[in-house]
A protein has these predicted regions:
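Short, low-complexity disordered leader/linker segments with a strong preference
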Residues: 1-28, 53, 80, 102-109, ...
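Hydrophobic alpha-helical segments within soluble ligand-binding/sensing domains
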Residues: 25, 72, 128-153, 167, ...
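Hinge/cleft segment of the Venus flytrap/periplasmic-binding protein
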Residues: 25-27, 164, 175, 179-182, ...
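Extracytoplasmic "Venus flytrap"
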Residues: 27-54, 59-74, 84, 90-94, ...
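Short, solvent-exposed amphipathic alpha-helices that sit
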Residues: 39-54, 135-142, 163-183, 197-201, ...
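Short beta-strand elements in bilobed, periplasmic/extracellular small-molecule ligand-binding domains
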Residues: 53-65, 155, 176-193
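Hydrophobic alpha-helical
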Residues: 77-80, 85-106, 172, 191-253
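Flexible loop/hinge segments that line or gate small-molecule binding clefts
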Residues: 95-134, 138, 145, 152, ...
Length: 323
């Protein structure tokens, strides 16, 4: 299995150029997601570990009450007012978040996008997250392989305000288009990365079209959990599913044979290494002019935190797969 954390540390060592100016004081990082969501929970421990391991003053996880851009902006402004001097943010809006990032950068508070990118032009220093399009593409290819290259599939995905959702929808479509005409997407259900809408819409789909669908790909946390539970409750292993992330419901469904596999991400590594890099930026480090950035549809300053497919053969050691 790939050691993602080691890879990311090595990658940053290659692209950062120390130009120390001194006198920047103690780094206090705020890690702010777009709203409440289980994916981001790992950022809390990541920040605590970054403080301990790298000598940061703070690296605190703070969550807006709702998925609302204005609430996220108000929270960020409040945190900066409390003395936080570096911000890692999951964009509440791929374009709209740029306004506050620019204001912070102008005020000497460096920022970066974490787990999802803002669109360029931007004053964010970089975007560090899963190549979500590539992950969705690989997951769909694994599903197509499990289906023997033919069948009807459904795609359940996340919030439409999430900058990753469109990338995932396009990637699933690309993988299907490469399947030689044997695979058809019969339903895409988006904007369901919360339990109530996911439970309602996925179970309604299964009741109405469960007999017609051969495979399911989920590209957001909550739809993966709800779909895995639905297949488990049905007790029918005919439908193949590839999920995302590492919720215990999904992992148990893999062990029990109701889910084929899941695409793991690395939220802990994002928060841990992201905090480290923001400290280096505040100390005066600069990125090399020839830094080997990756490019996505949103940015040409992207670092991939990694993704890996896990199935029944290695689900018991999935923690190792995330490292």
């Amino acid at each position: 299995m790939k050691k993602f954390l080691t890879f990311v540390i090595t990658f940053f060592a290659l692209i950062s150029s120390p130009v120390f100016a001194g006198g920047h004081g103690v780094t206090k990082v705020a890690l702010v997601p777009g709203g409440p969501h289980p994916y981001f929970a790992a950022w809390e421990q990541a920040g605590l570990d970054a403080v301990k391991d790298f000598g940061l003053g703070k690296a605190d996880y703070r969550v807006p009450a709702e998925w609302d851009l204005s609430q996220q902006n108000e929270l960020i402004e409040s945190l900066v007012g409390q003395g936080y001097n570096a911000v890692l943010v999951f964009p509440g809006d791929a374009v709209g978040t740029n306004k506050i990032l620019g204001e912070l950068d102008d005020a000497g508070v460096p920022t970066a996008a974490l787990a999802g990118c803002v669109e360029q032009p931007t004053q964010a220093k970089f975007c560090f997250g899963t190549d979500t399009g590539h992950s969705a593409y690989l997951g769909t290819k694994e599903l197509i392989k499990a289906l023997g290259g033919k069948g009807k599939i459904a795609h359940f995905t996340g919030f439409l305000v999430d900058p990753n959702t469109t990338l995932r929808i396009n990637a699933v479509e690309q993988a299907v288009s490469e399947a030689g005409g044997g695979v058809e997407i019969i339903q895409v259900i988006a904007d369901i990365d919360a339990y109530e809408p996911a439970d309602e819409k996925i179970n309604a789909f299964m009741a109405a079209q469960g007999g017609e669908v051969d495979g399911i790909v989920t590209t957001a946390w909550v739809p993966a959990v709800v779909a895995a539970q639905a297949l488990t409750n049905m007790g029918d292993k005919r439908i193949k599913m590839v999920g995302i992330d590492h919720d215990e419901v999904v992992l148990k469904a893999i062990k029990d044979g109701f889910v084929h596999g899941t695409m793991l991400q690395n939220p802990y590594g994002q928060g841990y290494i992201g905090s480290y890099v923001m400290d280096k930026v505040r100390q005066g480090c600069e990125f090399k002019s020839d830094a080997p950035w990756k490019s996505t549809a949103q940015t040409d300053q992207f670092i991939d935190s990694g993704t890996v497919f896990v199935d029944i053969s290695d689900v018991d050691t999935y923690v190792m797969a995330m490292r």
